[in-house]
Amino acid sequence: MLLWPLRGWAARALRCFGPGSRGSPASGPGPRRVQRRAWPPDKEQEKEKKSVICVEGNIASGKTTCLEFFSNATDVEVLTEPVSKWRNVRGHNPLGLMYHDASRWGLTLQTYVQLTMLDRHTRPQVSSVRLMERSIHSARYIFVENLYRSGKMPEVDYVVLSEWFDWILRNMDVSVDLIVYLRTNPETCYQRLKKRCREEEKVIPLEYLEAIHHLHEEWLIKGSLFPMAAPVLVIEADHHMERMLELFEQNRDRILTPENRKHCP
């Protein structure tokens, strides 16, 4: 029932100004460079005073630990992934369904992920620094891409999601000022994942984590195929908790101070 009103709204949006409008030809699958709209001067000035930082990384790479570390910093707001929403959409659990049958439920989950992450990006920012767990960019470049490459998402589903993502980039402000990449060995993630024992994650194999790691490397290290959403600060995150907290402290200024972010490699 949830999809019917969305379909009607989507059809109207597409006719008016959505993907493929103005006679632009449809292109093949795959990420594309997207021309973003120019934002009003007052919005640009407001953005100059505020920063959005996304913490990216594999499943169980330490993102929650990173967010918790900086959550007590002055004038920092933290937005976690809306996992609780993905687990319960009017009584349904699309996250759990996707992990058990990605071919059937991949599009369902990723459509909702894109919507909820868009909500995260566009909600009013009350602090100077917003720290987000992942982003709408990694939803597209990592998780949608993995479903498609692994053969679990048909090309038509992939193209439709990509068209919506490109439209969002052109028409909505989902910009990011810095990406903190917690670079973690897939085997380390797998061991951590087994220890925390979340219900939906019990079926995740090591091969899945390896595929997700490979896509993060393509996007954030090699800079190949995918557009870079922001400068990237890489933190090696295979270490134990105490060492990770030390690394977060060492990188505090590079993460929270705008002038220092410009010098991130």
From Swiss-Prot:
The EC number(s) this enzyme carries: 2.7.1.21, 2.7.1.74, 2.7.1.-
Subcellular localization, as worded in the UniProt entry: Mitochondrion
Entry-linked Pfam families: dNK
Gene Ontology CC terms: cytoplasm; mitochondrial matrix; mitochondrion
Keywords in alphabetical order: ATP-binding, Disease variant, DNA synthesis, Kinase, Mitochondrion, Nucleotide-binding, Primary mitochondrial disease, Progressive external ophthalmoplegia, Transferase, Transit peptide
Coiled-coil stretches noted in the UniProt entry, renumbered to this chain: none
Keyword Mitochondrion: yes
Binding-site list for ATP: G57, N58, I59, A60, S61, G62, K63, T64, T65
Top-rank taxon: Eukaryota
Low complexity composition bias: residue spans: 20-32
One biological process term in Gene Ontology: pyrimidine nucleoside salvage
Consequence when changing T188A: In PEOB3; reduction of activity; reduced affinity for ATP
Catalytic reaction(s) noted: thymidine + ATP = dTMP + ADP + H(+); 2'-deoxycytidine + ATP = dCMP + ADP + H(+); 2'-deoxyuridine + ATP = dUMP + ADP + H(+)
One example GO MF annotation: thymidine kinase activity
Enzyme class: transferase
Transit peptide: 1-33
Protein name: Thymidine kinase 2, mitochondrial
